[in-house]
Regions:
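Membrane-embedded alpha-helical bundles that constitute the cytochrome b-like, heme-associated redox core
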Residues: 1-240
Length: 240
């Protein structure tokens, strides 16, 4: 049986917005920046570090919190645009190709912020995280172990889903699409991590942000389900 060509609107024909090299450089820059600020600067330039961060620096904690919130918003942005693409609402705004590019961009930059969010905590003296506690889920027993692990697992799933775009041709469109369903788990885990482990979750603006973004994702998800259920099925081929 000859191979069937995919429809022209299938995402398997879309190329990544960034090359693999550019994506790798972005992630390496996030890792290097966090490690330089948390480890190298205090060791090699303690005077400069103290002048920037103070004698008892809480700047690392503030940087981790702000990077975490930014990473969450980028994840939400990516998930929302992914749902807009699958619902075909993106045709109205901002257009299919632009929506795909924004979806990829937000995902990749979100990973970079997630890396910075975790690794910058190496400089925090209050929690005194080790590298292994930051990279291994349930590795920390001092601060909300389960709640922190939700974010760690969500990050790894997010990285797998995002970077799968670069191996889409190897794993096949069907496997790539199935892997993308993990985005719902990613968003749920990261949202739970932010609400349960984040010290800013008690602030009213942050609560409004979580409720608003969560409601939008929920609406787009139900809209996708309803449109898929009501979509006419292709007629079965007649057999001789």
């Amino acid at each position: 049986m000859p191979p069937v060509n995919p429809p022209p609107n299938r995402l398997d024909a879309v190329k990544p917005m960034f090359s693999a090299r550019a994506a790798l450089l972005m992630l390496v820059a996030a890792i290097g920046g966090a490690l330089a600020a948390a480890i190298v600067l205090p060791l090699w330039a303690p005077t400069l570090s103290e002048s920037l961060l103070g004698p008892e620096p809480k700047a690392y904690w503030y940087l981790a919190r702000s990077a975490g919130l930014a990473g969450y918003l980028l994840l939400w942005f990516s998930v929302a645009f992914g749902l807009l693409i699958s619902n075909r609402l993106a045709r109205a705004w901002p257009g299919g190709p632009a929506a795909v590019d924004l979806h990829q961009f937000a995902s990749l930059v979100g990973i970079a912020y997630g890396l910075f969010h975790a690794l910058i905590l190496l400089g925090d003296r209050y929690l005194s995280y080790t590298l292994w506690q930051l990279v291994i889920p349930f590795g920390s027993a001092d601060y909300r172990r389960v709640e922190v692990a939700l974010g760690q697992i969500g990050f790894y799933l997010m990285a797998a889903v995002t970077l799968s775009f670069y191996v889409r041709q190897r794993i096949g469109y069907r496997a790539w699409r199935l892997l993308h369903y993990a985005s719902f788990a990613v968003y749920s885990l990261v949202l739970a991590h932010g609400i349960l482990a984040g010290t800013d979750a008690s602030a009213l603006p942050v609560q409004v942000m979580y409720i608003g973004t969560g409601a939008i994702v929920l609406f787009l998800t139900f809209y996708r389900i309803l449109t898929a259920m009501n979509r006419p099925r292709p007629a079965a081929r007649e057999t001789a």
